[in-house]
Amino acid sequence: MGRNLTKEELKRHKEKALAKMEHYIDSLINSPVSKTRGKADKLSYWLEDWSTFLDFESRFSPSSLRRYKRGEIIKVHLGYNIGSEEGGLHYCVVVEKNNSKSSPVITVVPLTSVKKKSDVDHLHKGCIYLGNEPYTGLVSKITYIQRPLEKKVFDLKKEVDATYKTHPEDMHKFQKDLEDCARDLLLLKRMRNEINKAKLGSIALVGQITTISKIRIYDPKTNFDILSNVKLSNEKLDRIDQEIISNFTNRKI
């Protein structure tokens, strides 16, 4: 239960909290270490995003999103976290078997990319090597979307060229379609660059299983978004289940 403070007391508390945060960010900015200065940028981005999430909270309806199924890969904003907690925009796998469309939260396991120095045969407890499965699933989905999109762009360009020659005054009607295509192509390019990091394989961080607000979901939000229906195989999900049982229960496997 919150304290019963006056407006002036709340303002003083706010100013004290903001001053403390500003002092911390300034200390990061003034560091001679490039990596530490980078934290200032990431934290500032997160404060902006977090404020947006909080402002949107009262208007958010989980029913406006698609229904998420067990095994689906989603991209979420885990935030700016402490220590070794996973944070930032992250791919995760849904581990709930019956998440209601109206539920405001969902339970996920974060995924991370295999690094060149990673020894996938000797991972820490709570980590499961998934091989290239997430990468191949994402590449297949992107390729599936890219082909019809490129055809749409080709057909649209022909129509634009024909209209420009005969009725240049009607060119404005293509504006939205052109903007949509440009946005979708840019998104696909970014996704390709992003998932290339997972070429060496992916690891499920079962030890960092977490329940998040669906406000944090970046993609997919609808059945037509890039990540919709990209799933892990039942074999990989069974391995994640076994690790959850081993790590968080007294059941013998």
How does the language model describe each region?
Residues 87-98:
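Short beta-strand-centered aromatic/proline hotspots
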Residues 90, 103-109:
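Short aromatic-glycine-enriched beta-strand elements
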Residues 62-67, 83, 97:
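Short, surface-exposed secondary-structure edge patches
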